[in-house]
Amino acid sequence: ECNLIDVIQSSEDEVPVPYQDIPGAPYIQLPIDLQHKYKKESTLSLFKRIGKVPNIEDLFDELVTSPNVFHYRNKMEYGFSAIGYDRINKTDIDIFTLGFKRRGVWWMGDNLEKDSGLFDALVEDNISTIRKYCEATGLAPWHGPKREGFFRYFVVRKSYKTNQLLFNLVTTSLDLPQFDLNAFSKLLQDI
């Protein structure tokens, strides 16, 4: 087993996409046919290796794809962290983050600065606004190794039928009286 440390040269198969790269979408820069191929191979391999299903190909019917190549998820969970990833220096830094955890590192956050291509573009383009608001409250983001902090997760669900959003801010309870829920709700309604 091995862990990816750094990509020195991108694949010649990659195509430019206008989205921020995130750990949960390692194939997004590949054409959709290659994405499907690699996802199928990876899934079947996991069933063989971890599930101990040696004849998985005989049991597998077909890959069912989404009708949308981008913006197809109806739920996203963004994590807060007091330890962030510095993309320029490729190291961890003490910073208020809201976005995704770095691949393979449960305690380090990576800020989402723009649309990832997976969820609602309007929401994701405003995650940095939400992060700045939360940081300005003076309440701390979650610090995994220390197991302390106020802000834990920001979960968003989208109904594609009604085009409505449901927001869930997950916090610890200790500093809850210091958090202005009405002002935060107004921020979300104005987005």
Task: List the predicted regions and their residue ranges.
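Accessory RNA-recognition modules of RNA-modification enzymes
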Residues: 1-191
